[in-house]
Regions:
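Solvent-exposed loop/turn segments connecting transmembrane beta-strands
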Residues: 11-12, 46-53, 109-113, 154-162, ...
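Outer-membrane beta-barrel "beta-signal"
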Residues: 18, 117, 171, 190-202
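Envelope-exposed proteins and targeting segments
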Residues: 15-17, 36, 177, 194
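C-terminal hydrophobic structural anchor segments
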Residues: 122-163
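Short glycine-rich, acidic/polar surface loops and turns
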Residues: 164-169
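Conserved small/polar residues in nucleotide/adenosyl-binding loops
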Residues: 1
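Conserved active-site loop/cleft motifs that coordinate metal ions or position small ligands
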Residues: 143-145, 178-184
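C-terminal outer-membrane beta-barrel translocator/porin domains of Gram-negative envelope proteins
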Residues: 6-10, 17-22, 26-136
C-alpha cells in the first residue's frame, strides 16, 4: 500500500465514484411485515480521483418479509460484499455488526469477500388488553434467528464459516416501533454479545 501502518495507526485516503440501485416495497422499513428490499451498489476507487489505491467494491443486499399470523413475521436476508484490486486493509469486507451476524465483534473477521444468510422469526404478543397485565404483554414480543457468514479472498473461495444464532426481546414504544434487545451467539469463538437498538436488524 502507499501508506503503511505506523506506531500512531494506519492511514489511507480513498476517493471514488459509483452507482446505487434500490428497490423497496416494505410496508414500514424500520419494522417490516411484508415486502422486499433489494440494494445493488458498485464503487470504483482510483488514484486519478485523488485516492491512494485502485480498487473496486460490489455489494448486494436482499431482504424479504412474510406475515405468517397476527403480528407474526418471518424475515430473511442474503448479503454479499466484495472488493477487488489493491484494497487497503480498512476497506476489506467485514461481518459482525448489529445488523447481520450478531454475536461477532465488528471487524473481527474481514477479507475481500463476505457473504451472509440469515432467517429470523418475529412475534409480538397479541392479547385482548382487558387487564393491565395483558396490556403490558401486548407491548412485548420476541425474535429468534439463525444463519451463517462466509469469508474468503474471492467470491468463489470460502476460507471461513461463521455460524450464528440468537434470541431477542422486543418492547413496543409506539405502533410498529420497538426497542430491540438481542443476545447473539458466535459459535466460531464460543462468545456472545448483547445489542440495543430501535430498529430491526434487517
Amino acid at each position: 500500500y502507499k501508506r503503511q501502518g505506523t506506531a500512531s495507526g494506519y492511514s489511507t485516503f480513498n476517493s471514488g465514484v459509483g452507482f446505487l440501485l434500490t428497490y423497496d416495497s416494505r410496508d414500514i422499513p424500520a419494522n417490516a411485515y411484508k415486502g422486499i428490499y433489494l440494494d445493488f451498489r458498485g464503487l470504483m476507487y482510483q488514484k486519478f480521483l485523488g485516492g491512494d489505491n485502485n480498487f473496486y467494491r460490489l455489494e448486494v443486499d436482499y431482504r424479504q418479509y412474510k406475515k405468517v399470523g397476527n403480528r407474526k413475521v418471518i424475515a430473511w436476508t442474503a448479503q454479499t460484499k466484495n472488493v477487488f484490486g489493491d484494497v487497503p486493509m480498512n476497506q476489506y469486507a467485514l461481518s459482525g455488526t448489529p445488523f447481520d451476524l450478531r454475536g461477532y465483534y465488528m471487524g473481527q473477521y474481514r477479507d475481500k469477500s463476505s457473504h451472509v444468510v440469515l432467517a429470523e422469526y418475529r412475534q409480538m404478543f397479541n392479547t385482548d388488553k382487558s387487564t393491565w397485565v395483558k396490556r403490558m404483554l401486548h407491548h412485548l414480543g420476541f425474535v429468534a434467528w439463525g444463519g451463517c457468514g462466509f469469508m474468503g479472498p474471492t467470491m468463489g473461495k470460502i476460507e471461513g464459516v461463521l455460524p450464528n444464532a440468537g434470541v431477542g426481546l422486543r418492547i413496543e414504544v409506539q405502533p410498529r416501533m420497538n426497542v430491540r434487545l438481542d443476545f447473539g451467539r458466535n459459535f466460531a469463538n464460543d462468545q456472545s454479545l448483547f445489542y440495543f437498538n430501535m430498529t430491526e436488524a434487517f
